[in-house]
Amino acid sequence: MSFKLNSLKDNAGSRVGRVRVGRGIGSGLGKTAGRGQKGQKSRSGVSINGFAGGQMPIYMRLPKRGFNNVFSKDYAEVNLGVVQKLIESGRLDAKNPIDHQALKAAGVARGGKDGVRILGKGEIASKVAFKVAGISKAAREAVEKAGGSVEIIARRNVEKTDA
């Protein structure tokens, strides 16, 4: 058998037509339309989410845990190796101070409503000036060893100050 685009066919039974229920007793799915007789599940809008048939539901069996700390800081974290790659590719200019806006424009600082924090993974060879909300001890040592500088700026809700 030759294989041609005009001779392609579906496999038998791969496309089963939709069954129209409740269309007369001769179809076998008339009257109650496969829902059985009376009761909650025969009515429209059937299921009750989370209802476990009188058994204690899972969401009530498990304990309430944790809380949201209002004082927690949300930093966008960027590693030194990533910054070096951006400088080498020309997406960051080492002559200008590197801050949250510059890293966001380069596409590496996502989120971080409290600013950006630089971490020490990777190597930095360029002499750069960072203006960031936080920096790790190892990252600060690596930047200063390469001849760069670090200025910590306290920022709250960086997203709101962009406007």
From Swiss-Prot:
Pfam families, per this entry?
Ribosomal_L27A
- Cross-referenced InterPro entries, in alphabetical order? Ribosomal_uL15, Ribosomal_uL15/eL18, Ribosomal_uL15/eL18_sf, Ribosomal_uL15_bac-type, Ribosomal_uL15_CS
Q: Which UniProt keywords apply?
A: Ribonucleoprotein, Ribosomal protein, RNA-binding, rRNA-binding
Q: Name one GO biological process term.
A: translation
Q: Which GO terms describe its cellular component?
A: cytosolic large ribosomal subunit
Q: Where is the composition biased (Gly residues)?
A: 27-37
Question: What does the record give as the function of this protein?
Answer: Binds to the 23S rRNA.
Instruction: Please state which protein family the record places this protein in.
Output: Belongs to the universal ribosomal protein uL15 family.
Q: What is this protein called?
A: Large ribosomal subunit protein uL15
Q: Which organism is it from?
A: Zymomonas mobilis subsp. mobilis (strain ATCC 31821 / ZM4 / CP4)
